[in-house]
């Protein structure tokens, strides 16, 4: 069983925590992480792109010139895809890009992402972050003390002081434990969890 040091918000050691091997010591399979990240990114796509076919274009009802006798190529509509201002052939239409990934696979991928960050020593557990008021400057001071740059900070419950103080800092993303996902973990250089969030996560993923 792995253990991890617990720090306070000034980065002083205040204890340690045992990490469940079934959550933080699972074999990492890149293909599963890739599948889940692809699924997350696909679900984010709006899919509202659209082009008009010749039938959707306004006008083009009258035949431009008679069928025979002009010496020109025959034409039936000014909205043919061959014409400037005509419709588009096989252009994109609105669609849903999302695809299903089984819950067990998503859960396994989350464990793999956590294992990966722990093995790379890019994970930190902090006892608590306590701010006296909502102020970005106060959170910046904590982030600098902890050495955070491009970091994902995970809290157990939505704390308004923390959420509002951290939301305007470039490179810092703060989410609750139940929002934790594979894409955010892998995108961030550092994963920082409050102690109660780490405990809650372990219990849920065991």
Curated annotation (Swiss-Prot):
Instruction: Provide the alphabetized UniProt keywords.
Output: Ribonucleoprotein, Ribosomal protein, RNA-binding, rRNA-binding
Q: Where is this region: Disordered?
A: 44-87
Report which superkingdom the organism of origin falls in: Bacteria
State the oligomer form and interacting partners. Part of the 50S ribosomal subunit.
Keyword Cell cycle on entry: no
Record function comment? One of the primary rRNA binding proteins, this protein initially binds near the 5'-end of the 23S rRNA. It is important during the early stages of 50S assembly. It makes multiple contacts with different domains of the 23S rRNA in the assembled 50S subunit and ribosome. Forms part of the polypeptide exit tunnel.
Protein family (similarity comment): Belongs to the universal ribosomal protein uL4 family.
Question: Which named protein is this?
Answer: Large ribosomal subunit protein uL4
Q: Encoded by which gene?
A: rplD
Q: Which organism is it from?
A: Maridesulfovibrio salexigens (strain ATCC 14822 / DSM 2638 / NCIMB 8403 / VKM B-1763)
